[in-house]
Amino acid sequence: MDSRSPSLPDDRPDPPEQHLDARAGATLRGTAGPRGVRRILPFLGPAVIASIAYMDPGNFATNIEGGARYGYSLLWVILAANLMAMVIQNLSANLGIASGRNLPELIRERWPRPLVWFYWIQAELVAMATDLAEFLGAALAIQLLTGLPMFWGAVVTGVVTFWLLNLQKRGTRPLELAVGAFVLMIGVAYLVQVVLARPDLAAVGAGFVPRLQGPGSAYLAVGIIGATVMPHVIYLHSALTQGRIQTDTTEEKRRLVRLNRVDVIAAMGLAGLINMSMLAVAAATFHGKNVENAGDLTTAYQTLTPLLGPAASVLFAVALLASGLSSSAVGTMAGDVIMQGFMGFHIPLWLRRLITMLPAFIVILLGMDPSSVLILSQVILCFGVPFALVPLLLFTARRDVMGALVTRRSFTVIGWVIAVIIIALNGYLLWELLGG
């Protein structure tokens, strides 16, 4: 059986890289190997790539609007959403490790062909819609930083994402490190913004006490939690862990699952802190100051300068750029996994990147509002959530798929509770968006 991740086509070197596999193998076998933090470094990476989807331009808009309108009161919602995401992404990663298959492959192998075709079409549409919003977010950030028209910002975005995707020719690790650098860039930018904004620490603490301030905050809370699960990275995460590190025994797989849990908690925890920082900065800067339409990214950028100084605006745009570039590249990777998994074939990543860029250029040339496109992508995302969640929970609970690493019944119940909550909230959000 070929255990390579389908996100890495045949013309690239077989992952994982030899040095990564050697260090990881020593740890998994319990033989002499790296100690301390160095011991877990080979196992960090897949969740970092997946986590960037939780810091995409859509999250910027939602978090900024939440902080501007309701202060710190929705911090508890971000915390709850992040904990849910940890559970779901951990299940996805475990599926790839335990089964040697990714989620689209398992659906193709075990479900009727007509259903597989339906799954492929809806998953491709969700991935492309998500990528559209992320691509436009990066192009907008370039426009804010340089004054270039959106069209040329999109051209630069395309070139940089081509470069990012090309890193896979050198194996999985370079791409993991590059995406990790973008995550670090976003984190540092928001850490400095927190220092500049000086949020009220007592109010921040009170924000973790569950409460809602009327129907408006309830709707925004639904939007934050409803968008917790990103369908395309559920498919992708199971492929990123699939065959990344070679295991020879069930016990080695158990150890790999435990170490992978560290990867998920660390990466998703950092993503959660960054999202909380976004909301806290918006609350400290915009709340109570009659800033209209603060959720619009351009408005947020322009308003930061008079309130916190030009450095805050530049840092905001840099963070948005890092978010858009990396999440757009990850979206293209997810589309590659989706096609290979569901259909059994792939097109070159450069061709897929060209195809998925076209909608963004059309939107720009037509002069459409990027914020409106973000809302449209959210509607399409809502459609895709149950189609990724349900098979994930079904397969991870099956012993014939997971073997000895089948998910414990109590954890499966938690997963289904989370799934029901997220699917219900997405249904409500979808109804509201379409009704509006």
Swiss-Prot record:
GO cellular component: plasma membrane
Residue ranges crossing the lipid bilayer per the database entry: 40-60, 71-91, 115-135, 144-164, 177-197, 216-236, 264-284, 304-324, 354-374, 375-395, 411-431
Annotated keywords: Cell membrane, Ion transport, Membrane, Symport, Transmembrane, Transmembrane helix, Transport
Keyword Membrane: yes
Highest taxon above the source species: Bacteria
Paired cysteines (S-S): none
Membrane topology: Multi-pass membrane protein
InterPro entries linked to this entry: NRAMP_fam
GO molecular function: cadmium ion transmembrane transporter activity; manganese ion transmembrane transporter activity; metal ion binding; symporter activity
Compositional bias annotation for Basic and acidic residues: 1-22
Region (Disordered) location: 1-31
Coiled-coil residue windows: none
GO-annotated biological processes: iron ion transmembrane transport; manganese ion transport
Pfam families: Nramp
Localization (cell): Cell membrane
PANTHER family to which the protein is assigned, alphabetical: NATURAL RESISTANCE-ASSOCIATED MACROPHAGE PROTEIN 2, SOLUTE CARRIER PROTEIN FAMILY 11 MEMBER
Summary of the function given for this chain in its UniProt record: H(+)-stimulated, divalent metal cation uptake system.
NCBIfam families: nramp (TIGR01197), Nramp_1 (NF037982), PRK00701.1 (NF001923)
Family: Belongs to the NRAMP family.
Protein name (database record): Divalent metal cation transporter MntH
Gene for this chain: mntH
